[in-house]
A protein has these predicted regions:
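Short, extreme N-terminal segment that most often corresponds to the first beta-strand
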Residues: 1-21
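Acidic, low-complexity intrinsically disordered segments
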Residues: 35-89
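Generic structural motif
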Residues: 9-11, 23, 85-89
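Short, flexible N-terminal segments of the mature chain
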Residues: 16-42
């Protein structure tokens, strides 16, 4: 099972979080993108833009942050953090 933890922070305080599970046979990239899309829908947010720095952090650490600059719409938090909790190999 693949699980992605999505958290929103403001002033270093956790505002809201959710965990998205994916049992499909998709590739890891598809699972990440689909889970992020589901989390954004759940939290009523637009999907963030993946910058080169964000992609590199995610590839190395299985964790990354999307700042307000990563969103087209104005957001009411400082950053969104995503982290892979569990993966199928």
């Amino acid at each position: 099972m693949f699980r992605l933890w999505v958290k929103l922070f403001k002033d270093n305080h956790l505002l809201i979080d959710t965990t998205i599970c994916d049992d499909t046979a998709d590739t890891r990239t598809h699972k990440v993108m689909n889970s992020l899309e589901k989390a954004c829908y759940e939290m009523d947010l637009s999907k963030p833009i993946w910058l080169d720095n964000t992609i590199k952090d995610f590839q190395i650490h299985d964790k990354c942050r999307f700042t307000a600059d990563s969103f087209i719409e104005e957001v009411s938090f400082d950053y969104m953090e995503i982290q892979v909790l569990e993966e199928d190999y």
